[in-house]
C-alpha cells in the first residue's frame, strides 16, 4: 500500500457537440493510437445513422442502450481454504459504466458490417431494443452471479 495518499480521479471534459461527458468517454474507448478526431467522426456519424434508423433523439437511444448493457452484478474469484469460489458482488456505478462502454465497443468490432460507424449504429439500436451481443454478455454475467449466489457469504 502506498503511503503517499490517494490518486485523484481525473475528470473528462464534455464533448463539443452534445456537451456530454458520457459521449467523451465513449469516444475515448473507441479511440486507437491517440486518433481522437477519427474516433469522434465515427461516433458522431454513428449517432446520425441511429437517428435515421430510429427517428428518435440519438443520445436518448444511446443512453437506453447503455442502460441495457451495464451490468449490476459480477463474479469475483475468492480463495477460501484452498478452493477458489466465484463470489457474486455488486458493481459500483463508475465500473458499471466503463464495463458497459467497453463491451459495447468490443462487440461492435466483432460485428460483420462494412464500416465501424455502421457496426456501432447497429449495436446501439439493437442494445436499446434489448437484444444484441453486448446485452447477451450482460445477461450471461448476471446468470453467472445468480448461479453462484450460494457463495455470496464469502463477499469482502
Swiss-Prot record:
Listed CDD domains: uS7_Bacteria (cd14869)
Domain of life per record: Bacteria
Gene Ontology biological process terms, A to Z: translation
GO cellular component: small ribosomal subunit
GO molecular function: rRNA binding; structural constituent of ribosome; tRNA binding
SUPFAM superfamilies (alphabetical): Ribosomal protein S7 (SSF47973)
Subunit structure, as described in the record: Part of the 30S ribosomal subunit. Contacts proteins S9 and S11.
Physiological role: One of the primary rRNA binding proteins, it binds directly to 16S rRNA where it nucleates assembly of the head domain of the 30S subunit. Is located at the subunit interface close to the decoding center, probably blocks exit of the E-site tRNA.
Family in the record: Belongs to the universal ribosomal protein uS7 family.
Name this polypeptide is given: Small ribosomal subunit protein uS7
Lineage: Bacteria, Bacillati, Mycoplasmatota, Mollicutes, Acholeplasmatales
Gene: rpsG
Amino acid at each position: 500500500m502506498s503511503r503517499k495518499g490517494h490518486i485523484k480521479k481525473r475528470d473528462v471534459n464534455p464533448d463539443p457537440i452534445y456537451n456530454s461527458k458520457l459521449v467523451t468517454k465513449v469516444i475515448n474507448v473507441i479511440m486507437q493510437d491517440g486518433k481522437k478526431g477519427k474516433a469522434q467522426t465515427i461516433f458522431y456519424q454513428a449517432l446520425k445513422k441511429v437517428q435515421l434508423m430510429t427517428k428518435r433523439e440519438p443520445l436518448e437511444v444511446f443512453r437506453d442502450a447503455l442502460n441495457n448493457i451495464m451490468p449490476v452484478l459480477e463474479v469475483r474469484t475468492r480463495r477460501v481454504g484452498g478452493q477458489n469460489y466465484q463470489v457474486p458482488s455488486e458493481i459500483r456505478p463508475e465500473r458499471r459504466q466503463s464495463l458497459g462502454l467497453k463491451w459495447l465497443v468490443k462487440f461492435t468490432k466483432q460485428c460483420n458490417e462494412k464500416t465501424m460507424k455502421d457496426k456501432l449504429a447497429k449495436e446501439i439500436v439493437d442494445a436499446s431494443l434489448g437484444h444484441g451481443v453486448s446485452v447477451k454478455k450482460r445477461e450471461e454475467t448476471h446468470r453467472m452471479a445468480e448461479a453462484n449466489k450460494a457463495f455470496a457469504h464469502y463477499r469482502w
